Curated annotation (Swiss-Prot):
CDD domains: HDc (cd00077). The keyword Secreted does not apply. It comes from Mus musculus (Mouse). Mg(2+) binds at D430. This is 3',5'-cyclic-AMP phosphodiesterase 4C.
Amino acid sequence: MRRSGTALSFLWTERVREPVDSGVAPVSPLGGGVILRRFSGTLLLPPLSSRLGSSGEAESAAHVVFTIGTQGTQRNLGSAQSSFDLENGLPGGKGLLDAQSGPSLGRALQPPVHHVQRRESFLYRSDSDHEPSPKAVSRTSSAASDLHGEDMIVTPFAQVLASLRTVRNNVAALAHGPGSATRQVLLGTPPHSSQQAAPTEDSGLQLVQETLEELDWCLEQLETLQTRRSVGEMASNKFKRMLNRELSYLSETSRSGNQVSEYISQTFLDQQAEVELPQPPTEDDPWPMAQITELRRSSHTSLPTAAIPRFGVQTDQEEQLAKELEDTNKWGLDVFKVAELSGNRPLTAVIFSVFQERDLLKTFQIPADTLLAYLLTLEGHYHSDVAYHNSMHAADVVQSAHVLLGTPALEAVFTDLEVLAAIFACAIHDVDHPGVSNQFLINTNSELALMYNDSSVLENHHLAVGFKLLQGENCDIFRNLSTKQRLSLRRMVIDMVLATDMSKHMSLLADLKTMVETKKVTSLGVLLLDNYSDRIQVLQSLVHCADLSNPAKPLPLYRQWTERIMAEFFQQGDRERESGLDISPMCDKHTASMEKSQVGFIDYIAQPLWETWADLVHPDAQELLDTLEDNREWYQSRIPCSPPHTMGSDRFKFELTLEEAEEEEEEEDEGQCTALNRESSELPST
């Protein structure tokens, strides 16, 4: 029984983890293999509501409200006064939900209320051509008309948990049928006076059959689970397989569609192109480590604290800059205007403003002149001649992350040290970016590719430069941190910046979606974030969202960012053309479609990421999803007519892994068997 392509619909109804007479009726599969699941509670994020002065480690008062269903039943899950440790979590073996008395300060992530039907991403389609979901009635774009009003479970591990919960409910229902007293004794459950109506004999047989099918599917998933394969990787492989099929279809529609498909596949699916072995450096070439050690000295001079400008930059338009930076806490700050008013120092101005807004200078005892020295040095190592990956982009990512960290669902969740690490990671995440891709550096045998063994080349370089600059004169903004704090911050920053490698996108998305959906189907539905792995996963996703936030910004800003990224792509394409290299996808200025690239980018990358983030922080990101959809429609309406793509040798071919190829063969065999059975049934009998 193949159920890997099934999307599980998740109903938000009233159920608590109680004995088997909780009133949950068995749920039957609907047509198309979609199964309705019932939710056991609201997804919660316990806060860290009080802080220690300069330690950066919060005192956690985890007062959590547990909201059930629509009737508002609540559980106060107390206050556990303890500090969070990155290595060991909460001390004394306590959990964030240890029951104590105290007022409720927690924030519940409420189930989505679909006031307006919104287009869903391709993640909610079937991942099997032979097992279409109810919405996959045509091979049009998955974002064209996929609308649903229920919360869908699509990650394999969460589906397994949901199926097992259905099995439990079915067994409970059978136990309440004829002879239920005997069955209750066997199940170890005392009989209760108030029971649901007992199922009839026919419905009982149907329930048994459905239960066996659920168990068969769960066993199939668990039997194929590899010992070194994480549950997040299960979802990642599924999403990659689904995206490959979507892109294969898109590549057949037109020549520009083929380019968009190739770009998305090579950029976001962690697929390395075949390249020649790099040649060793010649005697005339500089030593590779010079890329790190020979950093440019800052031209600024140290200023006394009293003389430091309000926003860290010398400008004769300080009042206009102050008015613009009033939007620092709002989504959609005009970074281009900030750059204009700050003398092309947007990163310094934005970070200086954010640090003051969050009182980080006082919390971590950072001298203002030291912060200014580091920021000016850091911004000086961003290339102003690079169209997109410059200090304006870094400032935009910093400000976007600052807003996301302040969303009501997360504003009291992370410690000051974690917030500092996230902002610092955003600040350095593209420093010294040369304006070309990792693959370009690998293909051209660059020194950076040699230094970092072709693995996240630019991301490793950004980290090395960002931390190296701390060694400059009066630049160490972390000098007053304890050794433990400094090591913890460095670990977090490394993890966050490496996660900005776009080839890791699908794995990051799968891990986040698996985390969110798994917590939804567990009995409490509480996202504890009580260990480093879970906390850094959310922070990595937050930084990744900030890095891919352009499509969710107001259209005038989004259009400027789009023009800049395309200009940078075209500059790389020109360099590749001059060097006799194959031109990378979307880098050929003669054939690339800006409009189609943005629609494809939103459909297959931005929307799946942002709708998953919106699930985590619901309902705080709903306006961003609306903006994302509006921006998509704007670019969609401006796609020029493109000639159909001929099935020539230049068509991009999608490669399947061995596992995916085996699944394809199984599906083809099943299809052939079905066809043969159909033909044999149509033969006249003799």
